[in-house]
């Protein structure tokens, strides 16, 4: 009789423990409640580097004469840059000669056989000086320098190189904004905000401060650096 009671007690304890483990197993596998939020941070910055390719060309049937005119134009461009405080800013000088008679695919009907083009690349941290000079290129045209259009790449490109210096502050601000949004959601839903489950800083963008149709951010000296952080927070309660 006592052996039967002992066996029944052991069996009952086994059922109780089994139920405890099963219940807690389901609880551990219950889906975690999370909220996904985004935090935005922006900072207005000023370009700290200007890169400006100045391309000009001459054409004719006498190669030596064409090259002489290009040398004259090169002197005019260098003098113009020196006048605007950019005499030491020429980082590169390239020359290209095109002989139309040597182009098998070209038409034999042409006025000038030779085209000689030169490019002076200006690279300067004096952004204001470059901007002022770029607005005065009519002086070069008045001196007979034929500046060549480069389509959407015309004019200087204004760059901001200090992204890495401000990146930590931007990320901190973006995460703070995201946490504030998550805390508000937790409050409104009657929950408590838990730890970060997942985080994605996203891309850091450099945008024109004043957006305009067809305008590139490289054409504007004033820019906006933006970062968007996406975070998943656990919810408690």
Where are these regions (language model features)?
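Short, charged, surface-exposed interaction patches
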Residues: 2-237
